[in-house]
Amino acid sequence: MQSDNCLDSGSRKVYAAQCYRNPEWRLSTFTSEGSETSLSAKLLTERPAPIVATCLDSWGVLDDAIHHLTPKGSGIWNNVAFVRTTSFVPDWHIVFNSASLFGLPVDIEASPNRTIFAIGEPPTKAHRAFHEGQGKNTIVLTCDAELAARQNAARRFVLSPPITRSWSVNKTYDQLLVSEVVDKPLRLSWITSDIALLKGHRYRLAFLERLRKELDFDLFGRGFRLIGDKWNALAPYRYSIAFENTRADYYFTEKLMDCFVAETMPIYYGSPAITRFFPSDSMVLIDPEDKNVIPKIQEIIDSDLWKERRGAIREAKRLVLEKYNTFAYLAGFIESVQDKPLPPEIIHIDSPEVDFGIDE
């Protein structure tokens, strides 16, 4: 089949509609030695677990995430199976950011209080349309604390960490569970990009330029030195800078969690409340506004702090794998719901867009 990147506008719409009706058209069947085929890659006719959740997404990499983040790439966590299509009515529907990779509106027939909008975008005004969710009596998992605090009769808002890929290094849950990264001959790396669309991007780039003038480190990412697997820019390093584009209590991303799964100590700027989620000894917090921040980083990378705090870093790694792993988190939430499902109805789902006119 022709790559979707080569299709014209009209053909893309037809292809997108076919993908929604038949997601196996665009799914790869992921296998590795000793692993099962991902449940997301086939039409299910029987229940693989007591609870079945059908997934819709605008990620474009959800199936790869299911393969990497669940045991044996199975798509199952505890009592919940995360799938694409079924020949029976699933118990839950989960919408990851929005329902269509191509920005098309989608209608689903689902129980509203068994429909989750799982949002991974930053909690900025530019991204507010994602966090507001859609439908009546649906559930929105959002890291936007201001929005979650509001009383809203239309839908249930639940404050949560962002629902993202969790880690982006090319290692599976099973591989990371047994791996130990002992040999770290290199000092400091930073994986970032030259994207400068929003204020947070530009703030990060300004700090990067300061750092490059005064400190020796290895820089990777789009616009700098491309790398196929982030593991290779983290695992050999004792320290790596993890700099979020948005600063909010519940917002932390793979920038931080990639460090932990590679057992690298993050030098971190981001969530002011990050030590609620991970051990304080597992990272070093920095303030870009501190006039001594660069000498502080130099002192850190010259030290054996990584070795001294290896236990805390490994505990943070465990938390990424078992608690903040997207599918572990969603399974825990789903299993905690006690109310009865509402009757199914048609829920119309549009595709929100980032409002780049709001630069915050």
Model regions and ranges:
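Pol beta-like nucleotidyltransferase catalytic core
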Residues: 11-119, 130-223, 230-360
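Canonical radical SAM enzyme core domain
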Residues: 122-125
